[in-house]
């Protein structure tokens, strides 16, 4: 079954790069572009806009490679606190190095690193020395009292004037960071101040994929962005400045709308006039023009909202949040007429769990067929589901054993009697190792292994929270997993 696409990725690459070129020309040949969101692996965009490739942003920038240089901003405050990226589990300092390696891997010139909010933090000084030993240029930008509202001070020699001027040589300076709150926008505006002092024409623009400004406020794509940022208190809203200036309704998010009057005044103080009449004007995002099937992206976005709902429920069950985000996403679901059972794989999994009294799982195949997996003495429900899916995709009869019990038994013995595990059932990674070994001599097992790539993009649901290992295995296989917010046992610790 061919996946329906809702987004024209090639059109996007061409249109987006051309629009950035025109913005560079608008400002006389130099543009500071604040790059928000994920550059290398925008999986959220690829899920809600089927056809959008996770690496589309970096591929788009690659079309401008000869004009681009990269500046990475990292907050000295975050370095001092050893702040960690939640999705990667690494510090902002380490992620700065990862970003630089990643950009260089694509052939980009990384100009420098800016330490923002620098006030002599020892960790920042150590990091600067490390970067300089690696041959990178490092600049310091300092805290400004009254930022961002004391504009006369900010746009003066005692404000931006105290910051070190970042030497750049190309027409498009992409300012990125390891995470939010790193000071990307402040770096851009500080540079505009210094460029203007030197008589160099330069401008600022912002690139973020979401919310998509030329879709309706309550469009599922934009609501999916609200669901994704429910823990950040971001909300989409009509851009009142754009409506007043042009009589056109566009969508932006609250933080950009709230700060725009300040930014406009800063632009006016730096160069005499503001090039923008609204926060929408500042953006360069062309994604909305590349949607080719609205029905497809609406359906995909609704699925994403449901996945976010279950993810936040499980985070709350684990004690990682206070549950506020769950209530916010529930409100978004009500606006679209969704309930938790709107997710097609939920009811089949719950039905098997109710019938057997044990954890169960369900997965939707590419052709729409829903398969289930139940808990047995040999396999957990997720492993059983995976075997059933591989049999189905490979056209292997259900009665054929892909892994003989005689193969599973010694693995269980090793787990329990040697390694001290209490659960003898095979996890997904253990199952796949056993299946791969069997594939050496068994054509059916070999055919099953060959089906693994077909699982990418499939939806799955389990009636209990899985182990971190099984969750990670599903993630690596590209399966979009959700779980009921409960554990298999009533124990207090779930390792």
Model-assigned labels for residue ranges:
Residues 199-209, 393-404:
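Glycine-rich phosphate/pyrophosphate-binding loops
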Residues 378-394:
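A short, polar/charged loop-to-alpha-helix boundary motif
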Residues 179-180:
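The conserved Walker
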Residues 187:
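Hydrophobic positions on the alpha1 helix immediately C-terminal to the Walker A/P-loop
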Residues 203, 375-376:
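Residue-level structural signal for beta-strand termini and adjacent loop
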Residues 397-423:
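Substrate-recognition/cap regions that form aromatic- and gly/pro-loop-enriched pockets
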Residues 1-176, 191-352, 358, 365-367, ...:
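Flexible phosphate-sensing "switch/lid" loops adjacent to ATP/NTP-binding sites
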């Amino acid at each position: 079954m061919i996946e329906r696409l809702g987004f024209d990725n090639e059109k996007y690459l061409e249109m987006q790069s051309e629009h950035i070129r025109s913005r560079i020309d608008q400002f006389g040949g130099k543009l500071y572009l604040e790059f928000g969101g994920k550059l290398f692996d925008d999986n959220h965009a690829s899920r809600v806009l089927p056809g959008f490739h996770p690496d589309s942003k970096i591929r788009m920038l690659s079309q401008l490679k000869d004009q681009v240089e990269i500046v990475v901003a990292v907050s000295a405050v975050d370095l001092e606190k050893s702040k960690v990226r939640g999705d990667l589990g690494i510090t902002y300092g380490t992620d700065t190095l990862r970003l630089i390696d990643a950009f260089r891997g694509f052939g980009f010139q990384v100009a420098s690193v800016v330490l923002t909010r620098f006030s002599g933090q020892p960790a920042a000084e150590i990091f600067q020395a490390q970067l300089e030993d690696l041959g990178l240029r490092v600049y310091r930008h300092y805290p400004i009292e009254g930022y961002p509202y004391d504009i006369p001070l900010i746009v003066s020699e005692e404000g931006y004037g105290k910051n070190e001027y970042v030497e750049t040589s190309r027409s498009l300076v992409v300012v990125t960071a390891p995470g939010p709150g790193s000071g990307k926008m402040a770096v851009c505006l500080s540079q505009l101040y210094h460029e203007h002092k030197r008589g160099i024409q330069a401008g600022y623009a912002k690139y973020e994929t979401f919310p998509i400004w030329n879709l309706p406020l309550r469009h599922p794509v934009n609501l999916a962005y609200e669901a994704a940022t429910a823990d950040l208190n971001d909300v989409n809203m009509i851009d009142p400045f754009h409506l007043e200036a042009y009589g056109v309704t566009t969508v932006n998010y609250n933080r950009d709308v709230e700060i725009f009057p300040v930014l406009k005044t800063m632009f006016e103080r730096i160069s005499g006039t503001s090039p923008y009449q609204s926060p929408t004007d500042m953006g360069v995002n062309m994604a909305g023009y590349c949607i080719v099937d609205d029905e497809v992206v609406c359906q995909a976005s609704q699925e994403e909202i449901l996945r976010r709902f279950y993810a936040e429920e499980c985070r709350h069950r684990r004690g990682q949040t206070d549950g506020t985000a769950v209530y916010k996403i529930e409100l978004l679901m009500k606006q679209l007429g969704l309930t938790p059972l709107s997710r097609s794989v939920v009811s089949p999994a719950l039905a098997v769990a109710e019938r057997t009294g044990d954890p169960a799982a369900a997965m939707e195949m590419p052709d729409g067929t829903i398969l289930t997996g139940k808990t047995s003495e040999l396999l957990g429900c997720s492993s059983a589901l995976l075997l059933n899916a591989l049999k189905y995709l490979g056209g292997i009869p259900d009665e054929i054993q892909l892994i003989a019990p005689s193969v599973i038994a010694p693995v269980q013995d090793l787990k329990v009697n040697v390694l001290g595990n209490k659960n003898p059932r095979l996890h997904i990674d253990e199952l796949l190792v056993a299946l791969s070994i069997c594939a050496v001599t068994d054509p059916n097992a070999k055919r099953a292994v060959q089906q693994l790539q077909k699982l990418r993009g499939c939806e799955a649901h389990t009636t209990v929270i899985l182990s971190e290992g099984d969750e990670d295995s599903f993630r690596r296989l590209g399966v979009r997993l959700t779980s009921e917010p409960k554990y298999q046992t009533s124990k207090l610790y779930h390792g």
